[in-house]
């Protein structure tokens, strides 16, 4: 892969992760965009012990958000649904908070 293709792919990831970050923030979560490689570090400010890192990958059917353990979250076409799923995972993982 050439430098231009790699740069374009990183720009695409950053763009989609930025859209997801905005959706997460409207749901009361904190999302920090990391650039190398592009990922989102997501935390619930009420339970800082619980966090998740999400990245963005190109698959045969398009671009998708992906949990750190490799499961696909949702298509990048639907960042709102992805944010809902991520919030559900974070909130239900918290030892001190009800969903």
Region spans (language model):
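Glycine-rich loop at the start of a catalytic domain that most often binds anionic cofactors/ligands
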Residues: 43-48
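Ampiphathic alpha-helical segments that act as solvent-exposed interaction surfaces
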Residues: 71-98
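Short, intrinsically disordered, low-complexity terminal/loop segments
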Residues: 2-3, 97-99
């Amino acid at each position: 892969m050439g430098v231009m293709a790699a740069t374009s792919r990183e720009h695409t990831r950053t763009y989609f992760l930025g859209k997801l970050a905005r959706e997460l923030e409207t749901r009361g979560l904190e999302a920090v965009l990391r650039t190398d490689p592009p990922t989102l570090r997501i935390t619930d400010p009420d339970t800082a012990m619980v966090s998740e890192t999400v990245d963005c990958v190109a698959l045969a059917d398009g671009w998708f958000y992906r949990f750190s353990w490799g499961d696909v979250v949702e298509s990048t076409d639907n960042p709102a649904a992805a944010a809902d799923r991520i919030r559900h995972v974070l909130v239900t993982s918290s030892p001190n908070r009800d969903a």
